[in-house]
Structure formats: C-alpha cells, structure tokens
Amino acid sequence: MYNVLLYDFRYRLGRCALLTGGLLCAALFGGCDSGMAPSIYDPDRSSLPDPVIESVTPEGSALAGVDAVTITGNNFSIQPHENLVYFGTDRGDVLEASATQLRVFAPNNPQPELELRMAVVGAENFSNTLPYRLDPPFVEFGDVRDFEDISGIATDSGGNLYASLTAFGAAVGIIRITPGGERSDYLSSPFPWADIEFGPDNSLYGVRSVRAIFQSTGKGSDFQVFAVIPNRSTRLTTVTVDANGRIWAAGNNSDLYSVEQDKSVKMYEFEADVRDIALFDDFLYVAGLQDEISMIWRFPIDANGDLGTAEEIMNITSQYGSTAFALSFSSTGQLYVGTDGTDPVILIQPDRTGAELYPNVLPQVVRRFAWGAGDALYAATNSTEFYPSGIIRIATRREGNRNF
C-alpha cells in the first residue's frame, strides 16, 4: 500500500512539473515578437574613398629587400598602418604616409612580374593595379656545384669571369664563365690559386701562397714563374696590376711588394697579415690584420711608383666586429669590403663613412671580388649552414673601377 501511494505521489509531482514548464515556455515564446529581427547593416554608413595609385618611384622596378618605393596618388591614410600595400601577394612595410604619398619598403621576394595594389582601412575596394617588378639584389652565378670550391677570381675586358676551381678537394685549374653563365676550361693547374688578376697586356697573373708571382699568356697556357721575391719566407696570397703593368702583391709578411715588367722587385716594410689589396686614384689600399685587429689602410703611390706612408682608413673590427677579406672600388670611389660579418659587404664612401650593403639580404662570407660588365660585382663566397660556397653576382647600380 505504501509503494502504491509513493508511486502516485511521484506521478502527480512529475505531471505538475511538466505542466508548469509548459506554461512557462508558452508565456516566454508567446511574449516574443514573431516579426523579422532588425538588420545590423547601417544603410547610412559612408565608407572612405577608394585609394588611387598614380605613379611609383623607382619606375617599373626596385631591388627586393633593398629599396624603399614611393607611391604617389590619392585617398591614402595618414596613418602608416592603415595602408596595406601589396607587391603581388607580399605586403610591403609602410615607412611613411600622407594623404597623397607613401614610402614603402619592398619585400625581399624577387618577382619578374607582379601587380602592385593597395587597400586603405575603411575603404571598400582595392586601388587600381600597376605592373611592377622586384629584381634580385644578388643571384648565384656560374653553376658551382656542392663538391666544388672557388678561390681567386678575375674578369677580363669583355666581362668574362675567371675562377680558380677545386673539385672534391683537388685543384682543377682556371675556368672561364661568360656573362650569360656558360662555363668552359681556360687552363689546367694542379694548384689552387689564392688570387688572380689580368694585366694591361691581357696576361693573367696569379699567386698561390709561395714567394713567386706566376703568369699565363692566354687560354691553354699554363702558369709560368714571372718573378720571385728574394725573401724565402714570403708567402703571397693577393695580387693586383696597375695601368703601367706594375704588379703589386702581398700576404702574411713583413713587406708589401711591387714587381716591374722587367721583373725587378721592390719591398716596402709593412708587417701585417694582408688579406687583399686594391688600387684607386694613385693609392694602394690594403686590408689586413695587425694584432688580430682587421684594418684598412692606404699608401700613396708617387710618380716613380714608390709607396709613401700608410694612412688608416677604417678599423673594421671595432666598427663592424668582423674581418675584411676583399676590396674593390666603384668608378666613383666607393670601396666595397667583403667580410665575415652577418651582413658581409661594407660600403665605404669617399668621405670614409661606412654602412653595410643590403642589410639582411646577402647571405655569405665574401672572400674575393671582381667587377663584371655594367654594375655586376662578382663575389667568391664561403659556405654556411644553408649555402654552399660559390659565386654570387651583386647588383650594385654602380660601374666598377678598372685599373687600366
């Protein structure tokens, strides 16, 4: 009897709860308006005018990851972050902004063809598009394989590049690479050449860490001894030739050396581990180490071809924390310095102010330079974790200096 009463009580309680809940739902839903909810779209809202691009400077193209591009037009935001500028699918970094002009850093992604366009926060549509191009600031050159290594490099008057090549650790000789990148054998040699340079007679001169300077008179002509330094401890690792055919050479020695075409040798006391030498405007420039400090000096050359007193140009170690390995001049006197720094090329102006060339773009240690045709500066590079050693061609937008 007790169980029956308990069941009846629970049954009635459940029916009461269901009835109460049903009435509550009916009240709630019955009180709602069954009409359409109001739209959140504001038909009276006005958007900003769409941006318009009229011109871009530099016109047509820029260096990827290097140049700041100026965009002129209308309806830009004066807040840099509200202007979204696209080079193809890559956004550029807006550095400065006004209502009619933007200054934008080009992204580091070379593309031969792209559409340049932009949007402004608050405007409904993109701007018009302009065809544009992002050129590479450097390219790998010469099809140097992973098992090959390059030491000395030089160029001839036709813009061909010559390189001392080793393969699987064994010297092969000198190869010639045309401006178009086609390789061919120039001469064979069982030795790697630390540095090579053409003279005004089209002879190729070379040094290879001994006390002699060698000469090749043309394709297929093996290197022959041209001159020997009297000091038996001398080791020559860098060489250059001036317009008179005078050869300058140096290394980790107590002297600098000049050799005339009659093979007479002059020595100039200067103790340093010299990594490279270069000529410009009647001066001999020297990159070397003294007491583990990397420096650049210059020596005046008088009318008799003799060196004057050394003058310090720049302390590379203190200013950049790196070591200078290579020197080369533009025709207007800018000095390119190849180093082992994170940004491996330093550009020194005639007033002796310096700056890293193309920061965050050039990837490898630079060991040697040689000017090609036009604005092409070739560099022999060391291997890194991500890049094998080889040759790169840097777009400098300057003509190279020729000694003759």
Which residue stretches match the model-derived regions?
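A short beta-strand motif characteristic of beta-propeller blades
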Residues: 136-145, 181-188, 221-230, 262-269, ...
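Short loop/turn segments immediately following the C-termini of beta-strands
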Residues: 121, 165-168, 208-211, 244, ...
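Blade-level signature of beta-propeller repeat domains, shared across WD40, Kelch, NHL, RCC1
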Residues: 364-404
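A short loop-to-beta-strand structural motif that recurs across blades of beta-propeller domains
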Residues: 172-176, 211-215, 255-258, 295-297, ...
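Beta-rich, blade/repeat-based domains predominating
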Residues: 146-159, 189-203, 208, 230-253, ...
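Short loop/turn segments that connect beta-strands within beta-propeller blades
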Residues: 135-136, 177-182, 216-221, 259-263, ...
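C-terminal motif of bacterial Sec signal peptides marking the signal peptidase cleavage site
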Residues: 27-31
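Beta-strand/beta-sandwich contexts
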Residues: 33-78, 112, 123-144
